[in-house]
Amino acid sequence: MVKIKTTHVGSLPRSNELSSLLASKDNQEKIDISSFDAMVKKNVSEVVKKQINSGLDSVSDGEMSKISYATYIKDRVDGFSGESERKAPKDLDDFPSFKKKLILSGGTPTYKRPCCTSELKIKDEVSVKKDILNFKNALEENSHTDGFMNSPSPGVICNFLPNKFYKNDDEYLEKLSDIMKFEYEKITESGLYLSLIHI
């Protein structure tokens, strides 16, 4: 019988405590970094165990350390500031009462979405290494080796953190590709699979 390996994609639920810390961090409020790191480590360990126990073959760290799957880049790369215009999905335009209800219920993301306003430069080389270490430790705790780590494609970053500095989006995408190479290489060099998010 042929075994078909199973996996999934996307962020996984964080604990209320971690969600609160991520929101505070995103709002540039002062947080205790050692407490944050410990909470991320705990959440990664728990989410890896849950995935394995559910029968998945290839598991992820659930993106526990990140406020969102794309905008966390603003915390690791210099060159972003301000706030970008938020556009509701086009399909909601056909249902204005539902769209209004969704907005009033808090069903729209409130995390920061700045624009690229200056030259992009890596400012944080440590966070991706922490993510990898937490994930590899959680895999080892569970005697599991098949793991993948998500990272946004340059196109996704361009969509969520729009260009207001480079002469056009092609130049912006090229610069993002150069910048993201660091994170992509760290993930693959660690022996983990790299899952590029492109939507």
Identify the residue ranges that each predicted region occupies:
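Domain-level signal for soluble alpha/beta catalytic cores
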Residues: 1-197
